[in-house]
Amino acid sequence: MSRTDDRKDHDIQPELVGYKEEIFPVNKSRLTWQRDLCFLGTTQRGYEVEFDVKYEEGCSPTETLLLSIAGCISIDVVHILQKMRCEITSYEMTAEGTRQLTPPQYYKSVDLMIHVSGKGLTPAKIDRAIALSLNKYCSVYHSLRKDLAVNVKYEIEGLGS
């Protein structure tokens, strides 16, 4: 079966043409125990992630969750800004997640900071890209607890210099 056969046809917003139509409606992965509390995760496309609760040989599941939300929002924001004809020369997002101290120790809040530079960037464009990601497109964000507070700030580097 080809990749095309695995996908459902659906309407894609113009700002997302180029990557959202490549999303599978069902994702599969495999997690294999290695030793102690170390596991190897493998995606359906063969990418691997090592998990280690002791942080000696891999990351924790909560670290990858924080990276996943940062990655999902960043992919959306950069793609939407490019569709708005912005030329991004650098982009970095830092993420800080605050967790509940008692089990199940879920994330209560996530603070994200975007540092971006390039041509054609304006606060209005970045605000719009962030809003589209959070309100409509970021599947990781929309898969998490409804009471998770996600705060996104940004700095356009070199603006006004």
Whereabouts are the PLM-identified features?
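Alpha-helical metal-binding/catalytic segments enriched in His/Glu/Asp
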Residues: C72-I73
